Amino acid sequence: MNFFESIINFFKSLFWKQEMELTLVGLQGSGKTTLVNVISNGGFIEDTIPTIGFNMKKVTKGNVTIKLWDIGGQPRFRSMWERYCRGVNAIVFVVDSADREKFEQSKQALQDLINKPPLAKIPLLVVANKNDLPNSAGVDEMIQNLDLRGIVGREVCCYSISAKNSVNIDITLDWLIKHSSSVKN
């Protein structure tokens, strides 16, 4: 980006609000709803119930209004994932980094989703949630277990977070807001 583009983008950010849409998917119990609650309410809510179908929340962070689609992770709702991922600015795939027995199932669910032609080129953010728990996998291990280096044709990023303790939520939001100007399909 050259100097003049930077100045133009700065003035745009002052006068025009940006909107972005994100879809959060992942296996049940991975922490999708907790993450949405932390982003929208600024803190952890103890009694989070599993999402049946989907929930949507709008949140404003700075000059960006974010529409967050939280889709249920139970097997019966996974067929809905593609529909809610079409045309979004980014897909957020949430993984319980402490539940190692489900890594292979998470990998398969992720591959099934991102291999859908309508979702080509949509940026993917993988969040390895629950890093506050013992034996949780770090970023490098998550990248390896989910074969994230094998994903081509889209930007892919992975962060280790704790939605419960608000660890790395800021860098996660920064990455997502950076992609708010991504072209929607």
Curated annotation (Swiss-Prot):
GO MF, one annotated term: GTPase activity
Pfam annotation, one family: Arf
UniProt keywords, alphabetically: GTP-binding, Nucleotide-binding
The keyword Nucleotide-binding appears for this protein: yes
Any GO BP annotation: protein transport
Keyword Nucleotide-binding: yes
GO terms for cellular component: lysosomal membrane
PANTHER family: ADP-RIBOSYLATION FACTOR-LIKE PROTEIN 8
Name of the protein described by the UniProt record: ADP-ribosylation factor-like protein 8
Organism name: Dictyostelium discoideum (Social amoeba)
Gene label: arl8
